[in-house]
Amino acid sequence: HLAKWIDNSIPVFKQPEFSYIAIVLDDMGLNKKIMSEVVELGGPLTLSFLSYAPNLIEQTTIASSKGHELMLHLPMEPLGDEDPGPGALLVDMKNMELNQRLNLALEKFPNFIGINNHMGSRFTSNSKLMEFLISSLKKRGYLFLDSVTTSRSVALKMGRRLSAPVVARDIFLDDVDSEKEVKLRLAQTELIA
């Protein structure tokens, strides 16, 4: 079966009278203490691990054994000067180099459902590059979750055009470091669901 985004997903037994919320925790893998706390949370949760984090196989095996779903958090070029991290997909790269970086990232650990962008506001707003990325992921059976780091992202439009599994986040829960703000955004998330 080629649809890894289905094969590697955690089954959820839905009752039709309820709405459901998917929570994705990204930037995983760099802080061992946070990782050990997060994997003990109830769930299942979807944990997205940075492609350049250390000990990825060990960390993702632990997360998976605790019942959590896995994603690959792939660095992509942002607007501005911030460094997205090692192995980032950059807008001035040719398809061959993009493909090499993508292949290296996809081999970091097994059993994930797809990728989401780490940063990437410049990359995800480029139609040609997103067509290349989304078609490459579709061929390999992975989904793309757009972190929506820019309102100019073309990911959803490209996913529809290519009949590829592409989804976008609705709300960032913690882009403001405040418990009060996170609770407010959780309430907004419930309203959307």
How would you describe each model-predicted region?
Residues 20-27, 86-96, 175-181:
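Active-site mouth loops of central-metabolism enzymes
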Residues 21, 46-47, 89, 120-121, ...:
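Short, contiguous strand/loop micro-motifs
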Residues 95-186:
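Catalytic domains of cell-wall/extracellular-matrix polysaccharide-remodeling enzymes
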